[in-house]
Amino acid sequence: MPRHQDPLIGLTTYGRNADNRFTLPAEYIDAVRRAGGIPVLIPPGESHWKAVVETLDALILTGGGDIDPGRYGGRRHETNYGIDLERDALEIELARWVMDSGLPTLGICRGAQVLNVTRGGKLIEHIPDEVGERILHRAPPREPIAHGIRLKAGSRLARIFGREEFEAASWHHQALRGVAEGFEAVGHAPDGTIEAIELTSHPWLIAVQWHPELTAASDPLQQKLFDAIVEEARRGS
């Protein structure tokens, strides 16, 4: 049985900004509310994170700045931005916990990268350097752009969306360099960049490199991802 009739959905937030405020784009919160969930924000530096997540019915690891390359044996790049060691530390702890506990989890953009890095995976530090720019994954200087996604037939994501091909909002300059042990790549961009992964041993752990929250208010297809995690939370996975 689920813990709550209206599921509590944890969302990680950005680190402190110049005004000493923790923030999170409203699109994440709105998408969870539309799905019938109650958003619970988890900011970096939360020392009692375990007490918080033990009350949750699901967790969303949100997008944001780059992960410290030291976490995956990478190197600093001139395009790195938003590196936040406090946020890295919290989200990697959360990722370990949800992978062990079975809590329904959705990773979005940075969240997908956190999950991969937590299990020993690596990242491409800057997509144009290695993959090229046949497909843009963000518009200059750092704005969202749309491109195609192709999902693996029969994957959990393909079942959620009810189709295997669609356009999605992209906003990243880094990507997964292969998948960590236990993950399966189930979505790709036309240039071969990994766009979605699932943890095969987990009851419900999905991560996407694109940003479904950006268009979910006007695109029912992207809202389905939030509907799906809230529904899974209701079932008490």
Regions found by a protein language model. Give the residues of each.
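N-terminal beta1-alpha1 cap of cysteine-dependent amidohydrolase-like domains
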Residues: 1-108, 116-118, 124, 128-160, ...
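The feature captures the ABC ATPase H-loop/switch
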Residues: 112
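Catalytic cores of DNA base-excision repair glycosylases
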Residues: 161-167
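Active-site-proximal beta-strand elements of phosphoester/diester hydrolases
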Residues: 206-209
